[in-house]
């Protein structure tokens, strides 16, 4: 999937998509704000949130210079929605990939469980960010309306028309294969390998460039992480932790869900959610077996907690760091205080919604 994303970026797909949507809303700031939030969430369902923010934030900065508005509110909203969108599917945020592959859940399982929670939460989050920033957005829209600007044509973003068409077809095929993999019997890993091979063949002489741009550090990190977690599992430490949660909750499933969800969210706000999720998987597995509760319920609580909790602080998720860095390069500093003032309440709201929806659906 990394190779596919690099191939799409190479031909200008992401910049074209952003510019196309901006043109559709006639470059008005408020509709643009809402559109980019929704776009961020949708793209993050299939593409890693770092890539989504890299391109969305860059285009946001470019449009802010044209339309004379402060890009910080839009970048913050995009970052949160990227993390939220990633929670909706198995191939979104890395914790979901780990949870899905370790516990045997499919793309459809995530889409019909965490995806429903993410979809409802997205509506609430859009309203939240609009209420928080509506005065600033309205002022920016009024200023933009008074200026005469020439806007770039979306087609200018396409660097290779033939490659653009091929990359779009490959992306659509990937989406179809991921959505239907439970029915076809194809594993997510097989689909990823197939898509990467097709992308490399389509890239031709640029195939080596795509291979060089793969994030090998992340891949090696995953390999090492699984080895460490396997070692912890063998020592029995994780079973002790599972028993501890079981003792605290006293076998009460409602309390178990709350503990897993909120501990995951709080921990992920300060530590990398990937190793945390990997560590928690055998814990919830042991907890499920010991307390005779449905493992999937605990898995959805873990997924939502780790995916959303990272949004609360600037260091909680990689997408946050990328968004802040992009804004800083353009001269817009986002300090801890400003970030947490906006993002922490949004995180609490979504984690609260997640808990209530899990209660309503499974208890």
What are these regions (language model features)?
Residues 18, 51-62, 75, 89-103, ...:
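Re-entrant/interfacial helical elements at transmembrane boundaries that shape
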Residues 29-41, 68-87, 119, 253-267, ...:
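Alpha-helical transmembrane segments of multi-pass membrane proteins
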Residues 1-70, 217-290:
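Membrane-embedded alpha-helical segments and adjacent helix-loop junctions characteristic
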Residues 122-206:
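Long, contiguous bundles of hydrophobic transmembrane helices that form the permeation core
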Residues 66-72, 76, 88-91, 108-159, ...:
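Juxtamembrane and boundary regions of transmembrane helices in multi-pass small-molecule transporters
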């Amino acid at each position: 999937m990394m190779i596919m994303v690099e191939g799409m970026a190479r031909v200008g797909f992401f910049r074209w998509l952003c510019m196309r949507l901006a043109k559709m809303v006639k470059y008005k700031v408020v509709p643009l704000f809402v559109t980019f939030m929704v776009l961020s969430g949708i793209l993050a369902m299939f593409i890693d949130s770092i890539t989504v923010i890299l391109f969305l934030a860059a285009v946001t900065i470019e449009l802010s210079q044209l339309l004379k508005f402060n890009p910080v509110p839009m970048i913050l909203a995009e970052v949160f929605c990227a993390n939220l969108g990633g929670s909706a599917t198995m191939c979104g945020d890395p914790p979901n990939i780990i949870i899905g592959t370790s516990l045997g859940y499919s793309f459809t399982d995530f889409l019909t469980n965490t995806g429903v929670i993410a979809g409802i939460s997205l509506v609430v989050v859009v309203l939240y960010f609009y209420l928080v920033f509506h005065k600033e957005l309205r002022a920016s829209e009024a200023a933009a309306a008074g200026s005469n600007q020439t806007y770039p044509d979306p087609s200018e973003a396409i660097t290779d028309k033939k490659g653009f068409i091929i990359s779009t077809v490959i992306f659509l095929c990937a989406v179809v294969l991921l959505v239907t993999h439970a029915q076809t019997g194809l594993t997510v890993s097989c689909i990823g390998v197939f898509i990467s091979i097709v992308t490399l063949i389509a890239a031709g002489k640029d195939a080596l460039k795509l291979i060089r741009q793969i994030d090998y550090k992340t891949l090696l990190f995953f390999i090492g992480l699984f080895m460490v977690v396997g070692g912890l599992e063998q020592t029995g430490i994780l079973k002790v932790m599972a028993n501890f949660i079981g003792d605290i909750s006293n076998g009460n499933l409602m309390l178990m869900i709350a503990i897993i969800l909120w501990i995951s969210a709080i921990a992920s706000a300060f530590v990398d959610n990937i190793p945390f999720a990997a560590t928690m998987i055998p814990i919830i597995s042991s907890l499920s077996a010991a307390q005779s509760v449905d493992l999937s319920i605990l898995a959805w609580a873990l997924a939502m907690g780790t995916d959303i909790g990272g949004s609360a602080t600037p260091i909680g998720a990689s997408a946050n760091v990328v968004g802040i860095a992009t804004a800083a390069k353009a001269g817009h500093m986002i300090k801890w205080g400003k970030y947490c003032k906006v993002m922490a309440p949004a995180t609490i709201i979504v984690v609260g919604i997640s808990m209530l929806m899990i209660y309503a659906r499974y208890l």
